[in-house]
Structures are given as structure tokens and as C-alpha cells.
Amino acid sequence: MGRLVRLTEQGFIDLVASLSRAARGPRGAGWRPVLGIGDDAAVLPSAGRLHTLLTTDLLTDGVHFRAAWTPGFLLGKKALSVNLSDIAAMGGVPRACVFSDGFPRRTRPAYARDVARGLADQARRHGLAIVGGDTCAARSLFLNVALLGAVEPGREVRRSGARAGDGLYVTGALGAAAAGL
């Protein structure tokens, strides 16, 4: 068995980038993402008038939140909100999402229902559809949302586009996520 190595955040980013290089997508027909790894969302070409935005975020108990401290309703809202902020940062409009979760067997059913209610409430508030998902038993609670959005070609806001003098806007309390709130 190999030696266990702890990955840093940059190590995880590098791992994802290497996976991207290994799997470039459909062959032929010139399909390529407009913008891939390294921004808030991928920008994908579309047959329609708008480009498709795709983002995903995974939240894990003990890393991104503490289930013992976090009401289920707020956790469900957070799971979608972290993805909504990625689409907004790219200048896009959210359209639809899929949601996956893993709950420990000891989880109270009311807590799981509250998570689902929080996610559904946030989806309604932003006019987007929940179109599917998956669930499983897990050792520790995790939630994952993949969100599709839309943006006009050439209008996506990229991280590389920031310039001196641009406005920077913050919602919520700085450091709250790191504090598990």
C-alpha cells in the first residue's frame, strides 16, 4: 500500500487540472469549453443564443460546516447559495440544478427534510428548477449541488478580467463560512 500524503488546497487544484488534461471531452466537431478549470464556473458552448455555465460545490461536515451547529434549513440554503454565487460572479443567470447528499444512518429524518426544504426555498427564491439528484448513506454528512446557468457569449465575467479601480462587493459577514456559520 502506498504512503498516505496530505494534499494542500493547491494540491487538490492541481489534481483537478491534471484530470482535465487527461479527459478533454468529445472528439471531433471542434467541441471545446469556452472557459474551463480556473474560474468560478466553466463556460460551455451551446447550440442556442446563450453559453451554458456549469459549477459544482461539495460541502462536508467537519470541513465546510458543523451539522451539530447548523440548522438543516440553513444548510440546504447554503449548499445552493455557494453555487449561486459562482454563477453570479460569472455574470450569469441560474437555470437548473441537481442535488446529491449523503447522510449518516443516525441522522434524524426531520433534519434531512429541513435540508431539502432549505434547498427548495432557495431555488424558488432564485427561479431555478431542481431537476434531479442522488442520495446515499455516508459516514459523515455531505451535500453537493451542480448548477447550470446561462450567459451571453462574450459577457461572462472572468477572474482574469479584474482591473484596478473595479468595485468589490461583499454580502454577508466576512469569515462566517470559515467559522462554520
Functional labels for PLM-detected ranges:
Residues 1-71, 90, 99, 114, ...:
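Extreme N-terminal cap/leader segments of soluble proteins
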Residues 59, 93-181:
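Glycine-rich anion-binding loops of enzyme active sites
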Residues 73-90:
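Alpha-helical scaffold segments that flank or form the walls of functional sites
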